[in-house]
Amino acid sequence: MMSLACAFCVQAGDEIVFTTVLENPITPVKNQNRSGTCWAYATIGYIEAELLRTTGKVYDLSEMFVASKDYVDCAEYHVRMHGNSRFSEGGSADDVLEVINRHGICPEEAMARPGSMIGDTLANFTEFFTTLEPYVESIAKGTSTKLTTQWKVGLQGILDAYLGKCPETFTYAGKQYTPKSFAQALGINKNDYVSITSFTHHPFYEQFVIEAPYKWRPRPSWNVTLDEMMTTIDQALKDGYTVCWGGDVSEDGFTRTGLGIAADIEHAPDLTGSDAARWLKLTKAEKAESLKKLGAQTPELVPTQALRQERFDNWQSTYDHVMLT
């Protein structure tokens, strides 16, 4: 498998044809299915790509191990905050690095496969989180004046029932490991990885914690200019590295046809003037269909530092999906 940076052209009939301009090796893509664990799948994929780059070996690491450990950490934090924080399926790349640092990691084969505890072949958190979230909230916002530790037993029971038990020891390639010793053997060090971002509401060339609902761990990012951020990403890809990044899939220009479009509605054919006003009244599905028809011919906005900041401030652009490039 390869991590692709692509350019595209349009052939007759508006068929979108992608041309590969750069490809870096990655492990096979996995399906998060009906689980809000893009953060775990994308970042584990990134770690696997790093191991492939540095060792030449293909590893299949367990996303559910990471999810289980992270939900314990997040639940404990949520309870300490008396419910005044966020507890949900979502997370960030920071969570994966911190889980590996604190708890280690295991291969996929050492733990129950995603979905297998409920008879599915892929992760499905529909029943799981409608059980887990109210349980944690009932503790965090309960009426108790003194908590016992038994709530943690119940929490772990729910996690084990739906995700499977995290192994204390396991055998891999003929050797016995703990999750911590396995992470050490792989050489995974969270301090080897740098997070960068670009906003003007904080000084450039300083670190700050991005204000996003899913980022409950206070791991900071370096703030650089937009041009410097993109130059850094481009250079990393050219040097053979992959990039794990957080973005927005809730905007109208996100499609499932391989295109992410920052549509310039004012200059889009059939969407100008009164049609532009009509555009604002369309449902999300109707907007998606309009963009699908225009495809690669859709006029796009030119991203600027000011536009990025404006859309972050007014909630048009949010941090709601983690991906691997």
Range-by-range predicted roles:
Residues 1-7:
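Bacterial N-terminal signal peptides
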Residues 12-323:
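Catalytic-core signature of thiol
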